[in-house]
Amino acid sequence: MKKKEQSLDIISLPIELDRTKIESRYRLALIAAQRAAELSLGATAKIDKKGKKVTTTALLEILSNKIDYITGEEAVKAKEKIDQIDVKKLLEDKRKAIPDLSELEKDLKVYLHGKESAEKMLEDLFTEGESNSSNEQE
């Protein structure tokens, strides 16, 4: 028996690449990989799914111009801008906004603790009264 040669392409569909938008298959593969990752994490597809795999859907979305992407100098500038964003500072700013919520949580805990203490005192009072009356009856 002869083995059939298997194609190791990303998909088995023929791809017509517009060289004015995407200059190489390598660039197409990078963009498709990023989009496939988004799709696998639950992003909604922008076209009707013709394939079963997220890579096929991603490629079809890109080739049908349903996905916005940047390349070249514009991509370099965007990457530099992202690198300048201080993630730690953003997280600290979010944490500063959280103490307001934690103050409310503290107040709620104090209220609930006070309520539980009052209920326990009433319970102890009535159980103590019952035990005293049962001792007197004996």
From Swiss-Prot:
Q: What is its EC number?
A: 2.7.7.6
Q: Which domain of life is it from?
A: Bacteria
SMART domains assigned to the protein according to its UniProt record, in alphabetical order: RNA_pol_Rpb6 (SM01409)
Catalysed reaction equations from the record: RNA(n) + a ribonucleoside 5'-triphosphate = RNA(n+1) + diphosphate
Say which family it is in: Belongs to the RNA polymerase subunit omega family.
Q: What does this protein do?
A: Promotes RNA polymerase assembly. Latches the N- and C-terminal regions of the beta' subunit thereby facilitating its interaction with the beta and alpha subunits.
Record-given protein name: DNA-directed RNA polymerase subunit omega
Query: To which species is this protein native?
Result: Thermodesulfovibrio yellowstonii (strain ATCC 51303 / DSM 11347 / YP87)
Q: What is the lineage of its organism?
A: Bacteria, Pseudomonadati, Nitrospirota, Thermodesulfovibrionia, Thermodesulfovibrionales
